[in-house]
Design a protein with these regions (language model features):
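TOPRIM metal-binding catalytic domain and adjacent DNA-binding surface shared by DnaG-type primases
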Residues: 1-68
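Detector for Asparagine
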Residues: 2, 29-31, 67, 74, ...
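A general marker of short, structured functional hotspots
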Residues: 5, 11, 19, 34, ...
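Short, Lys/Arg-enriched charge-dense amphipathic segments
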Residues: 14-24, 28-30, 34-35, 70-84, ...
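A generic structural signal for short, well-ordered alpha-helical segments in conserved domains
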Residues: 36, 125, 184-185
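Glycine-centered flexibility motif
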Residues: 56-57, 96-103, 177-184, 188
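Phosphate-handling DNA/RNA-contact segment within nucleic-acid enzymes
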Residues: 61-158
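TOPRIM fold recognition
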Residues: 130-201
Length: 201
């Protein structure tokens, strides 16, 4: 579609049913002109925020389709998840997850303080940071790349310093408004089951 290609979100049920496929990072393009143009002009994300994540090797442009590539890492710095977002602005945008990605390590940033902001998609996370830039690198953020709670539960496990969960980012930026009540309820149930953090909504 408009030169974009990939696969759409897959449910957690499908992750369990499918035979695991090898995880391979998409090949990088030699420049990031289309990614910067799309994120800055179409999504109004601050250049400094984009560059910060680029320097962390968390955002780049793929060579084949010029999608934005969002990379999620595990605690030892190994890439474990890739979400791709098309840069074409006409028609239905492509969004997809690379085969073999571990949903526990979707696009996220751990800054070390005691609150985590939760979002549905990486674009929403970057938009929020662009709006609230003061001391942003001290905070924690996670993009679920869908609506399952795997990545939220993982960032809480890996960062015991986090005591509060801010649902506001998820509620304000989600495109799937009809599912927010059930998602919030599922988070609360998961946290109760694990004896984990307070809600900071």
């Amino acid at each position: 579609l408009n030169g974009e290609e990939g696969e759409t979100y897959r449910s957690s049920e499908r992750y369990r049913e499918e035979i695991p496929k090898p995880f391979v990072l998409p090949e990088k393009n030699e420049n990031m002109r289309r990614v910067y143009a799309y994120l800055m002009k179409a999504r109004c994300i601050d250049h400094r925020i984009i560059t910060s994540f680029v320097k962390k090797d968390m955002i780049y442009e793929d060579k084949k389709y010029h999608n934005v590539v969002f990379v999620g890492y595990n605690p030892v710095g190994m890439p474990r998840h890739v979400h791709k977002r098309g840069t074409y602005t006409k028609g239905e945008p492509f969004k997809g997850t690379v085969d073999g990605s571990d949903p526990h390590y979707s696009f996220h940033y751990a800054g070390g303080d005691n609150i985590v902001y939760v979002f549905e998609a990486p674009i929403d996370m970057l938009s929020f940071i662009s709006l609230y830039q003061e001391d942003w690198e001290k905070h924690n953020y996670v993009a679920l790349c869908g609506v399952a709670e795997h990545a939220l539960m993982q960032i809480l496990k890996d960062n015991p310093n986090i005591k509060r969960i801010a649902h506001t980012g998820l509620y304000l930026t989600s495109r799937n408004c009809g599912g927010m009540e059930s998602i919030g309820q599922r988070f609360r149930e998961s946290l109760l089951d694990t004896g984990n953090k307070e809600n900071g909504s």
